[in-house]
């Protein structure tokens, strides 16, 4: 795979994380750049590892991985999105009374895993091609780092406009990504 194809693949794989990061950034009250970078680093690290894991699985048992990865991503994203929506409605009355909670490490990791399962499936496919899997995985991770950090900052702007309803919007974005993953699986 040439450098152009690798870069296009990398940024294509980062789009789910970008969308999820917009939702995350919107739910926080003015996230700092350091929080955006932390999110980008977590999403980027997970997105670097998942194609490597997928590649390894592709060498072993590609059929099982491809059969179930979309369902796993769907369930995780529906759960996380539903949780965000519930939190958004639960806190709608006391919007200015307390600052919004920060996203914990494990919540970010879970979201990153849910949005990166497609990269694992790509890794399975790459196992059957002549590619430098390390360079490709690093490119995907770097693109995701950039796009997730940018997504958090875009989300910051959106969140400052729509306030607490941003948590509901963020949950809807995650659910939308989950539905899109399932739709793509069934309708190509």
UniProtKB/Swiss-Prot annotation:
InterPro entries: Mntp/YtaF (IPR003810), Put_MntP (IPR022929)
One annotated GO molecular function: manganese ion transmembrane transporter activity
GO-annotated cellular components: plasma membrane
Pfam families associated with the record: Mntp
Main location: membrane
Transmembrane segments: 3-23, 66-86, 106-128, 143-163, 168-188
Subcellular compartments: Cell inner membrane
Assigned keywords, A-Z: Cell inner membrane, Cell membrane, Ion transport, Manganese, Membrane, Transmembrane, Transmembrane helix, Transport
Membrane topology: Multi-pass membrane protein
Similarity comment: family membership: Belongs to the MntP (TC 9.B.29) family.
Role according to the record: Probably functions as a manganese efflux pump.
Record HAMAP family: MntP_pump
NCBIfam families registered for this protein in UniProt: PRK11469.1 (NF008546)
Name of the protein in its database record: Probable manganese efflux pump MntP
Source organism phylogeny: Bacteria, Pseudomonadati, Pseudomonadota, Gammaproteobacteria, Enterobacterales
Gene responsible for this protein: mntP
